[in-house]
């Protein structure tokens, strides 16, 4: 406990008072390279605390976080979505959805294109062809 007390009461104030913080706006332009390097650690701490606070308290940051769920709307009442398609019923080829965005489940309708554009993903359909 004594080391924490020493750090808070003595070391931290001494460190902060030794930082080369200028008194005027023009003083920032007169700082040397060594002075700028000395300002990096406290700046990184302040930016880190600000970022963590933003992530914890800002509703917009929390809204963007993903739940990890890939199926947002297809047959949600079922415990597991399974489709059996007889290969004999496929004409020459069929494209099946892998992104869960289609309105024509289980067939692909190209909905992944907008998803890929918005998220930078590269998902596409599974294409089955008959020989």
From Swiss-Prot:
Cytoplasmic compartment residues: 59-131
Pfam family of the protein (one): MitoNEET_N
Lumenal topological intervals: 1-35
Record-level Gene Ontology MF annotations: 2 iron, 2 sulfur cluster binding; metal ion binding
Swiss-Prot/TrEMBL GO biological process terms: intracellular iron ion homeostasis; mitochondrial transport; regulation of autophagy
GO cellular component: endoplasmic reticulum membrane; mitochondrial outer membrane
Compartments where found: Endoplasmic reticulum membrane
Annotated cofactor note: Binds 1 [2Fe-2S] cluster.
Cofactor(s) it depends on: [2Fe-2S] cluster
Cysteine disulfide links: none
Positions annotated to bind [2Fe-2S] cluster: 97, 99, 108, 112
InterPro entries for this protein: CISD1/2 (IPR045131), FeS-contain_CDGSH-typ (IPR018967), FeS-contain_mitoNEET_N (IPR019610), MitoNEET_CISD (IPR042216)
Regions that span the bilayer: 36-58
Topology in the lipid bilayer: Single-pass membrane protein
Coiled-coil segments: none
Keywords: 2Fe-2S, Endoplasmic reticulum, Iron, Iron-sulfur, Membrane, Metal-binding, Transmembrane, Transmembrane helix
Family recorded in the similarity comment: Belongs to the CISD protein family. CISD2 subfamily.
Protein name (Swiss-Prot/TrEMBL): CDGSH iron-sulfur domain-containing protein 2 homolog
Organism: Drosophila mojavensis (Fruit fly)
Gene name tied to this protein: Cisd2
């Amino acid at each position: 406990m004594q080391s924490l007390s020493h750090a808070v009461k003595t070391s931290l104030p001494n460190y902060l008072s030794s930082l080369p913080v200028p008194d005027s706006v023009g003083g920032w332009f007169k700082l040397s390279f060594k002075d700028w390097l000395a300002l990096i650690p406290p700046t990184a701490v302040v930016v880190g605390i600000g970022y963590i606070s933003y992530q914890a308290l800002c509703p917009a940051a929390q809204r963007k976080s993903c739940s990890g769920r890939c199926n947002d709307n297809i047959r949600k009442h079922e415990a597991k979505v399974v489709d059996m398609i007889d290969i004999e019923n496929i004409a020459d080829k069929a494209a099946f959805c892998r992104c869960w965005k289609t309105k024509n489940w289980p067939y692909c309708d190209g909905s992944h294109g907008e998803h890929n554009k918005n998220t930078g993903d590269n998902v596409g359909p599974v294409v089955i062809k008959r020989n």
